[in-house]
Amino acid sequence: MPGRKARRNAPLNPTRAELPPEFAAQLRKIGDKVYCTWSAPDITAVLAQMPGKKSRKSTMRRSPSPTRVPADLKDECDQLRRIGDKVNLRQKLLNFISKLFNLIT
């Protein structure tokens, strides 16, 4: 908006203390464990090691399996087959029309 001044950055909070080095190192180790081995049992074990933290319900849920349910796969195959049939029909019609025009010229 014209005529409006840009906001300044938020002032520094002097009451905010820096983490002691041992806490920072512990958080780094926990973060490395979480990011390197990304599975629900490992995360809950790492969260259990953290003092004062409880594991969330979302981490307790089982991660979705990478394999699909066969019914969903069959439905998707049927849908792709129908799409392929439509494309094939359009291509055949286009070829037929182009042959008709080529015969005239």
Curated annotation (Swiss-Prot):
The keyword Repeat applies. Keywords: Apoptosis, Mitochondrion, Repeat. A motif (BH3 1) lies at residues 27-35. Signal peptide: none annotated. Residues 92-101 are annotated as: Required for mitochondrial location. It is found in: Mitochondrion. Residues 50-72 are annotated as: Disordered. GO terms for cellular component: Bcl-2 family protein complex; cytosol; mitochondrion; nucleus. It comes from the Eukaryota. Interacts with MCL1. Interacts with BCL2A1. Interacts with BAX. Interacts with BCL2L10. Belongs to the PMAIP1 family. The BH3 motif is essential for pro-apoptotic activity. Promotes activation of caspases and apoptosis. Promotes mitochondrial membrane changes and efflux of apoptogenic proteins from the mitochondria. Contributes to p53/TP53-dependent apoptosis after radiation exposure. Promotes proteasomal degradation of MCL1. Competes with BAK1 and with BIM/BCL2L11 for binding to MCL1; can displace BAK1 and BIM/BCL2L11 from their binding sites. This is Phorbol-12-myristate-13-acetate-induced protein 1. It comes from Rattus norvegicus. The gene is Pmaip1.
